[in-house]
Amino acid sequence: MTAAGPRRVLVTGASRGLGLRAAEALADRGWSVVLGCRRVGDVGPVLARARGRGAPVSAVALDVTDPGSVAAAVAAVAELGGPLHALVNNAGVFRHEEEEFQDLRPGDALDLLLTNACGPLLVTRAFLPLLRAAGGAAVVNVTSRDADEDTFDGLFTGYRMAKAALNAMTRNLAIALRPDRIVVNAVDPGWIPTDMGGPEAPDSLDAAVAAVAGAVELAGGDRTGRLLRAQRPPGSPGRRRADGATRR
């Protein structure tokens, strides 16, 4: 917390899953949290609970694939007053239908790239003035181990490609934004039991939340351009394919 009040963080895709849990954890750590979600009404109960215990939280409508929505979100966050000390690019999509390459639909391919790669890039660009104003900030991109070449198995090509692009963005922006004291890192949360990951996911949601929150708190430091991984439970089997094999 600073003399002017708590540091502010925006979390995209914060209406459920990892984004919501990370937002709640950051509020508990003393951050002023802005939940970015496509429908603000979805987080009404969350806002009420957080405010009931004195946490400084708010929400803005934000669709990371819509430039108009992004611009409106920037204006809404600016109206809250003060700079933005951290941005968590968590919003993402996964399409089970594209498991086999021949089943990939053009619309899904575009959606994967727009949401998982272009969205974080354009959101970061739009919020750059507010991040610069903090005098030391953090951008955290939620990625996936599916982008690692040693996991390639011929499945989910569009998703892997989009997350690999996100990793390239992370490394390049870490260099570009270093003069502004903005660290840019990626976090691999593992395969976690959320709406996206499914109930059979073997990795720890709590560990993923801790990894994201820890990356946010690197704001103003010098640890940048890194791929940070959540701690995995011993013997975690990785993601199970339809044929019974596993992948991580």
Tell where the protein language model's regions lie, with residue ranges.
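The beta1-alpha1 cofactor-binding region of Rossmann-like NAD(H)/NADP(H)-dependent oxidoreductases
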Residues: A61-A73
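Structural signature of the Rossmann-like NAD(P)-dependent dehydrogenase/reductase core
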Residues: V11-T12, N89-N90, A137-S144, V183-D188
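Conserved glycine-rich cofactor-binding loop
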Residues: S15-G17
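Hydrophobic positions on the long internal alpha-helix
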Residues: V88, V123-F127, L131, M169-T170
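Conserved glycine-rich Rossmann-like NAD(P)H-binding loop of the short-chain dehydrogenase/reductase
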Residues: R29-P45
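C-terminal helical subdomain
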Residues: P179-D180, A186-I192, G198-R248
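Catalytic loop of short-chain dehydrogenase/reductase
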Residues: V93, E100-L112, R132-P179
